[in-house]
Amino acid sequence: PEDMDTPRNVYKVSTQNPGSDVAAETAAALAAASIVFKDSDPSYSGKLLHTAMKVFDFADRYRGSYSDSIGSVVCPFYCSYSGHHDELLWGASWIHRASQNRSYLVYIKSNGHILGEDDDGFSASWDDKETGTKVLLVSKSFLERHVEEFQLYKAHSGNYICSLLPGTSNFQGQYTPGGLLYKASESNLQYVTSTTLLLLTYAKYLRTNGGVATCGSSKVTAETLISEAKKQVDYILGNNPAKISYMVGFG
């Protein structure tokens, strides 16, 4: 929706100047896209998935952060502050989701401890994929055959979801007087939109499995999560004290 006429320089990572974070993120995007096209265009879907695997292999084989390779042009605004480990798990999780190739499941199990499995994250953004990965890993299509092996992911993702919900004993979030989730003083909406996606994804998981989330002494249903997500989206689109839309080209 934006017209941009400013220079958009292109940079690359390589075996000598690695960028596991940006490469694994690319692999994740390609794998996710392959799921979208699986039924309507199987050939294209297969090409996307094959490319995702190749890009992920590059990301894993030549480890390092793109901030260290081309930091002079990406920092401080787009430094990889979370490092590259979270993207490696993110990429492997999406490729497994798309392919059901067990080798990626083995990769996640073998590398999870090193790449962030033990960390209980409370942020979701373009830079930090840790929480997003854990929510992805508890989705029914991934966990129905491997539930016991990923209980830690399920516990961490549940802690994250509960931390966002006012009225629960696990609540750790901050909201503005108008009701917008507040994560950072700069570019806050990126965190709001990422968090909203995770709320809806977790709600879908709950609905599919016919369960509820336990937040301390509170029981939270999928409908509660959907309602909170809707409040955030409505706020962004204009249902806020200022009565303005924060989405370019809408409202």
From Swiss-Prot:
It comes from the Eukaryota. This is Endoglucanase CX. Keywords: Carbohydrate metabolism, Cellulose degradation, Glycosidase, Hydrolase, Polysaccharide degradation. The keyword Hydrolase applies. GO terms for biological process: cellulose catabolic process. Belongs to the glycosyl hydrolase 9 (cellulase E) family. Degrades carboxymethylcellulose (CMC). It is an enzyme of class 3 (hydrolase). It catalyses: Endohydrolysis of (1->4)-beta-D-glucosidic linkages in cellulose, lichenin and cereal beta-D-glucans. Its EC number is 3.2.1.4. GO terms for molecular function: cellulase activity.
